[in-house]
Amino acid sequence: MSAKQLMFNENARHALLEGVNKVANTVKITLGPKGRNVVLDKAGGPVVTNDGVTIAKEIELKDKFENVGAKLIKEVASKTQDTTGDGTTTATVLAQAMITEGIKNITAGANPIEIKKGILKAVDAAVASIKAKSIEVKDKETINRIAIISANNDEEIGNLISEAMDRVGYNGVITVENSKTLETTLEHVEGMQFDRGYISPYMVTDQERRVVEFEEPYILITDRKISSLKTLIPVLEMIAQSGKPLLIIADDVDGEAQTALILNIIRGAIKVCAVKAPEFGDVRKEVLQDIAILTGGTVISEERNLAIEDVTLDMLGQARTVKVDQDKTTIVGGKGKKSDIDTRKKLIESQLNITEKKYDKTTLQNRLAKLSGGVAVIKAGAATETEVKEKKMRIDDALNATKAAVEEGYVAGGGVTLFRAIKALESMKADPEQMIGVNIVKRALEEPLRQIADNAGREGAEVIAMIKSNASETYGYNAKTDTYEDLLQAGVLDPTKVVRSGLQNAASIAGMLLSTEAVVVDFDEEKDKTSAAIII
């Protein structure tokens, strides 16, 4: 085991604070509509961004003790990103304010454990106040405003996101891809799409576009591997008599079965395309069942004691059209019963409500969306690769913030809801040392508003005084227009979940850091300084 450096008490906390400040001071200049950009020097070329978590993740400090502080503040941004996908800069600003004030008080002799308790109590009260002011999202215009603000006031992005949600529904899947043109566009994929293409280019029906397109096809759905021609003959004879095309979704189609299919296609005897089943393991079984219900077919599986030789026409699914390229399959207008599809959706929704794992949630959301309203794809276009990357980040931020607003509602933005939450702490009672923690949170709740004003070229203290003079809960400073007004009416909105999560994550990390008495890092005899540290 390598030698270690140890640092204790005040020295340790101040080293951590240095690291926190270096990250937070870099990130907080991006806050608000007039926040600045930061250029990141990356291997693929420089990236210009104002996304807090992206900036924070890039920072590594030379001093190992300071770097521990940097990692802790980065954790605030990462946790907020994981929870809501936005609000990372606000969370970082809140954490820095709590840590700075907390260390001042601990240095003066206050008990860090009691301060931590006070901080957590105050944050609980502030969160209750924020939730009480939350307004449910009910219209497209609100979604549009939230998306625009989260995309750094880009109206084009806001309009695309609100249109995408309008098309696929609030639970619909919206993805972001690179555009092959300079334009940023929205594409709506109706029906169900999954990431599996044709197993052989011989199956292509449109050679110029390299796609398979079938109208009114039958669909064979199975989790079995098809290798034997004998297995397929009864199905192919039925299809030939029907005169309709066939899409096969199977674990795989290989050997003489694949050869026979290709020969029949070349001869013009039948129209057929085979694709591998999407997903893996238990998820594959569920997705195949989704496809079967959507198309009115039956999954031919060992579990059901069904063999491919026993398939009848009524076991095959049907759809209006099917399109297959080398990467994906799209089924449009599945002919399953609406009642069966609705029952399936309710089952997935109930599973979504009880599952806690992020991967399982994402999988269930994707399945529900494909059964509900298809998939919307926002294609980010710009003149250079750097601009495309930056635009994709803004679209992702706006998309995540909008989804958060749909989930928990929205509040007045511009830092004013956090600022007004101070009122909820005025009447709090606690032990004297816990009250220090409460006062730390009071001071921290001003900081996002102060920083937004500073970034807009205004004096933070002056802006705070002006807002205090008006009793309205939603009256605040609109940095975009440089005016004081009712921010709800002006459309300056923040998702409740983003505001709440940022505050809770900031308090969690601040409490952890303030109650730290020692820091242990690796020691390199040639590189490391030894001042204020003990080497073991």
From Swiss-Prot:
Binding positions for ATP per the UniProt entry: 30-33, 86-90, 414, 494
GO BP, sorted A to Z: protein refolding
Gene3D superfamilies, per the entry: GroEL, GroEL-like equatorial domain, TCP-1-like chaperonin intermediate domain
Tree of life domain: Archaea
UniProt keywords, alphabetically: ATP-binding, Chaperone, Cytoplasm, Isomerase, Nucleotide-binding
InterPro entries, sorted: Chaperonin_Cpn60_CS, Cpn60/GroEL, Cpn60/GroEL/TCP-1, GroEL-like_apical_dom_sf, GROEL-like_equatorial_sf, TCP-1-like_intermed_sf
Presence of keyword Acyltransferase: no
Any GO molecular function: unfolded protein binding
Enzyme class: isomerase
Catalytic activity: ATP + H2O + a folded polypeptide = ADP + phosphate + an unfolded polypeptide
Listed EC numbers: 5.6.1.7
Subcellular location: Cytoplasm
Subunit structure and binding partners: Forms a cylinder of 14 subunits composed of two heptameric rings stacked back-to-back. Interacts with the co-chaperonin GroES.
UniProt record similarity statement: Belongs to the chaperonin (HSP60) family.
Function according to Swiss-Prot or TrEMBL: Together with its co-chaperonin GroES, plays an essential role in assisting protein folding. The GroEL-GroES system forms a nano-cage that allows encapsulation of the non-native substrate proteins and provides a physical environment optimized to promote and accelerate protein folding.
HAMAP family named in the record: CH60
Protein name from the UniProt record: Chaperonin GroEL
Species this chain originates from: Methanospirillum hungatei JF-1 (strain ATCC 27890 / DSM 864 / NBRC 100397 / JF-1)
Source taxonomy: Archaea, Methanobacteriati, Methanobacteriota, Stenosarchaea group, Methanomicrobia
